[in-house]
Regions:
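Short acidic/histidine- and often glycine-rich active-site loop of Leloir-type glycosyltransferases
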Residues: 34, 49-62
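Short hydrophobic beta-strand element within catalytic cores of glycosyltransferases
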Residues: 34, 39-46
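Active-site donor-binding acidic/aromatic loop of nucleotide-activated sugar
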Residues: 1-7, 14, 61-62
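C-terminal alpha-helical cap of glycosyltransferases
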Residues: 77, 101-119
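Aromatic "clamp/platform" in nucleotide-sugar-dependent glycosyltransferases that forms part
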Residues: 26
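Short alpha-helical donor nucleotide-sugar binding micro-motif in glycosyltransferases
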Residues: 13-18, 71, 108
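Conserved acidic donor-binding segment of nucleotide-sugar-dependent glycosyltransferases
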Residues: 46, 61-68, 77-82
Length: 119
């Protein structure tokens, strides 16, 4: 179902009403649905392409977005293997920690400090 112009609350509601966040994108600048889904405790499957692999870390099932079979097998694995799904959800909740504002700010401050020392 395609929906547009959703409020932040409506977006959150959509995530909360799903079981699996399906994001087999061919190209993205960042891949917000990955961390949005992980942040609300949903299992995510996404493309085995950058930047999705970097954003997802080891906390999402990666599939070949050009292969219907890979996507189908990924979905079936998430449906049938409860332990694997629960493990990905746990790792997803851990993964989102690196995208929280204080962590990002610290990374930038460390970079600026390093650059200042080098000059």
């Amino acid at each position: 179902v395609y929906k547009c112009d959703l409020s932040n609350q409506e977006i959150l509601d959509e995530y909360m009403n799903c079981d699996i966040v399906s994001f087999p994108s061919l190209y993205e600048g960042f891949g917000m649905p990955i961390i949005e889904g992980q942040a609300v405790g949903r299992v995510v499957f996404t493309s085995d392409l950058e930047p999705m692999k970097e954003i997802a870390g080891d906390a999402a099932l990666l599939v070949d977005p050009y292969s219907i079979e890979s996507i189908r097998n990924g979905v079936m694995k998430l449906i049938k293997n409860h332990h694997y799904r629960d493990d990905l959800i746990k790792r997803g909740l851990e993964n989102i920690e690196r995208f929280k504002l204080p962590v990002i700010v610290k990374c930038y401050m460390d970079l600026y400090t390093k650059l200042e020392r080098e000059n």
